């Protein structure tokens, strides 16, 4: 269906945006909570994931919160969303750069570059947000502020968001390709070693390779329909395709949720959650069970640990 969106269609898009952004907000908040709750996660690598999740929190928050009926709040919502969404995908380049510098170039100075990372992410996001404000007006539907339609406005939006976005996608793809290629070669070399410890490490690296291969696809999944929709808006500024707008809004709103699963919910986080769950469960049993059962409940985990140790050696 082509043409201007009806009030009902705009209401549907607003609800889709709220639903997807809420999932992203919950997922990103969970990752931030894990960073503060588990001291073992407060390493530099996960610190970068923390800032990624923090950007996603504010991107999702400003996507659904505001007062579009007032011009000031409408501008605040629109530009804040733009700023933090740009910062979000820029943090993925920092993570890719850090991994490449550590694995491929064998550098250990990445923590010394933290100040430069912040200057790069927040400074670049601010520059693109300021550029977008030139000659740009805002309108709204539902609870969201949208850029005023027109070729000039669409071109500005594309230049300040989608152009750097696809530059990030290309950079991440190339960077992870180099990292994966190098670790694949190392895994093939380890496969010829009879030592079981090296074979376990090789299988671990293979799991990491499979996971890293999906990282560049997250941004593609989140923004491919948005890119197509912006191109369509530029070519046909007075026409809208509802199903394309639906996919655009829905996938973009889920970016933070995708990031929280791929970057945040890694094996280290899952292991920390599992250990916390076992501790909580065992403490609960010790409070309610009699002494005889309490002894058996404490003895069984130790046997499981010994079995795991035997399996690993």
Regions from the PLM with identified roles:
Residues 128-185, 210:
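Extracellular-loop-to-transmembrane junctions of the mid-late helices
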Residues 11-39, 53, 90, 97:
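First transmembrane helix
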Residues 105-129:
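The cytoplasmic-loop to transmembrane-helix boundary for the fourth helix
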Residues 210-222, 226-230, 240-300:
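Seventh transmembrane helix
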Residues 1-17, 71-80, 143-161, 200-207, ...:
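Juxtamembrane membrane-interface segments at transmembrane-helix boundaries in membrane proteins
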Residues 182-228:
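Intracellular effector-coupling site of seven-transmembrane GPCRs
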Residues 10-14, 55-109:
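Extracellular TM2-ECL1-early TM3 structural module of rhodopsin-like
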